[in-house]
């Protein structure tokens, strides 16, 4: 009988596994853009530990192994910012990214002050864009990241997250 993947809040001791997973999972993005200086690949372990302490960080576990992760925070205007959603390459395409996305939306909305969710991905990242559109996100803009990648900015209203969770 196979193990199931569980999603929970990350602990400080998960930092190294998240760091390694992030580096592995974002290789395909770097290859897609021909740019290995994208922020998820250049982030330091200390910086990641700071995010673990300050933000909502969730992990997906298969046994003791971290196989997925996502981060989020809510700013003063009620925007839940979702970042660095990543899934181990061997588990991509099986719905784990969608589960992590729903879980972080629920966690960020739990405080009651979240009015919208915002995230971004590279303009060539079709699988990411498909995932986000399917989850109810729409394009609201774009910008060029400091590493030169053209980003697509997507949002959805927090109430849409509740509707999506009920209908999913």
Predicted segments with their positions:
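A short beta-loop-alpha structural element at the N-terminal edge
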Residues: 6-20
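Conserved GNAT-fold acetyl-CoA-binding loop/helix
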Residues: 19-48
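A short helix-loop-beta-strand connector motif used in the catalytic cores of GNAT acetyltransferases and
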Residues: 47-59
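Conserved beta-strand in the GNAT
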Residues: 59, 65-73, 81, 86
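Conserved acetyl-CoA-binding loop-helix of GNAT-fold acetyltransferases
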Residues: 87, 93-106, 130, 134
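Conserved beta-strand-loop-alpha-helix junction that forms the acyl-donor binding cleft
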Residues: 89, 118-129, 145-150
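Conserved active-site alpha-helix within GNAT-family acetyltransferase domains
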Residues: 98, 113, 123-141
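Conserved GNAT acetyl-CoA-binding A-motif
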Residues: 108-121
